[in-house]
Amino acid sequence: MRKKALIFTVIFGIIFLAVLLVSASIYKSAMAQKEEGHEAAAAEAKKETDLAHVDQVETFVGKEKYYVVKGTDKKGTALYVWVPADKKAKILSKEAKEGISEDKAAKIIKDEGLVSKQKEVHLAREGNVLLWEVTYLDKEGQYSLSYVDFTTGKILKNITP
């Protein structure tokens, strides 16, 4: 009886270890894809704009894929640079003070009475329109998002799947 329990424990341990290793491999692969292109986008942003120091790079995928590079110029002015994955599209750059802040975008959506619980706020872009993408749970608990114009603060689109 002890021998069967030992065999069962060893087999279970091997299966558990295999599942753990496969899961770790999948996670590592997914995270690598998430950050793929970030270094090239940061280099391109530095080359094509006044950006001197990169603080953060995020990927935005809407109608097109963009990398949003946040950083500062040589004077310490906060800059946002939208680098398209498609090299034919134009790189756009704005000083942070030229648009509304992340907090202001979130407040605009909250003031509309749409938000039950705010999730995230990220810079986004649709064509040449610069946006804040605000994700949240609405009053019915559905995961929703709204696009707020970076420059004007106007809500351009609300999406609830």
Curated annotation (Swiss-Prot):
<dbReference type="InterPro" id="IPR054944">
    <property type="entry name" value="regulator_TseB"/>
</dbReference>
<protein>
    <recommendedName>
        <fullName>Probable cell wall elongation regulator TseB</fullName>
    </recommendedName>
</protein>
<dbReference type="GO" id="GO:0005886">
    <property type="term" value="C:plasma membrane"/>
</dbReference>
<dbReference type="Pfam" id="PF17881">
    <property type="entry name" value="TseB"/>
</dbReference>
<keyword id="KW-0812">Transmembrane</keyword>
<comment type="function">
    <text>Required for normal cell shape. Plays an important role in cell wall elongation during exponential phase and spore outgrowth. Probably regulates the activity of the penicillin-binding protein PBP2A through a direct interaction. Not required for PBP2A activity, stability and localization.</text>
</comment>
<feature type="transmembrane region" description="Helical">
    <location>
        <begin position="6"/>
        <end position="26"/>
    </location>
</feature>
<dbReference type="InterPro" id="IPR025711">
    <property type="entry name" value="PepSY"/>
</dbReference>
<dbReference type="InterPro" id="IPR041401">
    <property type="entry name" value="TseB-like_dom"/>
</dbReference>
<keyword id="KW-0472">Membrane</keyword>
<dbReference type="GO" id="GO:0008360">
    <property type="term" value="P:regulation of cell shape"/>
</dbReference>
<keyword id="KW-0133">Cell shape</keyword>
<comment type="subunit">
    <text>Interacts with the penicillin-binding protein PBP2A, a monofunctional transpeptidase.</text>
</comment>
<dbReference type="InterPro" id="IPR046350">
    <property type="entry name" value="Cystatin_sf"/>
</dbReference>
<keyword id="KW-1003">Cell membrane</keyword>
<dbReference type="Pfam" id="PF03413">
    <property type="entry name" value="PepSY"/>
</dbReference>
<keyword id="KW-1133">Transmembrane helix</keyword>
<feature type="topological domain" description="Cytoplasmic">
    <location>
        <begin position="1"/>
        <end position="5"/>
    </location>
</feature>
<feature type="topological domain" description="Extracellular">
    <location>
        <begin position="27"/>
        <end position="161"/>
    </location>
</feature>
